[in-house]
Amino acid sequence: MWNVERGLNIDLIRAALTNPTQFNDLTSHDVPVENAAHHAAAESQLKKLQDIDLLILNEADLGMKRTNYDDVTADLASALHMNYAYGVEFIEVDPIFDLNSEEIHLPDSQQDQRLQTDLHVDAQKYHGLHGTAILSRYPLHNVRIFRLPVCYDWYATEFAAISSLEQGRRWSAKKLFKERIERELRHGGRMALIADISVPESPTGQATIVAAHLENKCTPACRKQQMTALLDQLKTIQNPVILAGDFNTTGSDNTPTSIRNEIMKRITDYQFWIKQTISWFNPLGFAKLALYPLHYFHAYNDPTAYHLPIVWDNRERPLFNYLENFRFDDGRTFDFRGRKRITDPPRARTLADSDARQWKGFVPTYSFARDYGGVVGRFKLDWIVVKPFTTNPRQSNQPLKFAPTYPTTMQELNSAPADRISDHPPITVDLPLTELPQRLRATSRQ
């Protein structure tokens, strides 16, 4: 699965998925010659991407100016020769950045002219859609959308914040630009896209794919409510189930970001405006100025770890407890075995066979960085969880057919370009359609 950050780098994404030669041509000048290990890992990951049969996308645009009005999902599905389904999560309706029903002006006439050009939206091309997709080499059946419980009202809450900003004080144009760039005015909410695929090797002849995107602007407790509602919807399914997506497991009520990232997702020519607006946000000129207090950013690599208030506060743990203890009506469970023998490099512990681990915690799938202080926090936000034919989430000696094996978090591939492909790397897992040798079933740890 891959959170593609709206498809801002669609050419690189497409090349990574379909054309290694083109990808290397696009990125070769960005890779330091001395970093041979990084390059070798990226090459291995690039090769692995060429063999995918199923792809889940989060944050895929359709008809947005920031992504040249492309249909990101259709573009990638065509390049991959895959079937696809797309579910709309949000309709973007910001009056300045999306609809052009309001204006913002800068005192410098040349900057203002360029800003108006960059903000202008072609109404004939604009659809304003943002969502989640499933792409598959297998035919898709019974496609449906399940709307998750609302944990954050994006339109009402953001509109109220904008109103208080603009009505409560007198703002300079630069200050107003900064405050508005941090807001996302849109209709809609988090959802899961669900589809069945035809798989002859499955006893039911099918597998069920669930592409989910949980809320970032809420507490971990509300994310657990969203997961609980989703699993209740899936409870009667007798097929193998692949549940994947951005669960936004930050441990807090928001995802860390930067002014740079916010400008990237709002204005097409973001590189120019990042350079121009550095001094507007910080007198020292840091392009990646944090929008959150410094104490918020800490290494948060294992949301499955034990929760010990004060000593080790892990408010995401209840969500994973619920996933582990969940039973489908057919008695099956999600696979939490974490078997060392089917991971590369060998790692054992919770979910190690479906989500790549490192020496401590999981390999992060989202990193927040500042130019003046390096990486501030690393987070494991994106997940793949699989229901194979297990009746106990931890017991080792159970079938490996349809069970997750050899997970990869493709950090090296994602960082091959100097400015990375997406703010999330792709993550993959192998699912064997036939039973694996008995010797691979052993060895699991909590």
Over which residues does each language-model region extend?
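Charged helix-capping and loop-helix junction motifs
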Residues: 69-72, 224-230
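Active-site environment of divalent metal-dependent phosphoester hydrolases
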Residues: 7-8, 62-65, 92-95, 153, ...
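Metal-dependent phosphoester/phosphodiester hydrolase catalytic core
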Residues: 143-190, 195-228, 253, 445
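N-terminal, active-site-proximal structural segment of metallo-dependent hydrolase catalytic domains
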Residues: 1-132, 148, 158, 162-183, ...
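Active-site flanking residues adjacent to catalytic metal/cofactor-binding acidic residues
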Residues: 2, 58, 212, 244-247
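Conserved hydrophobic/aromatic beta-strand scaffold that supports enzyme active sites
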Residues: 132-134, 192-196, 211, 382-384, ...
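Metal-dependent phosphoester-hydrolase catalytic domains
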Residues: 140-145, 220-221, 228, 234-242, ...
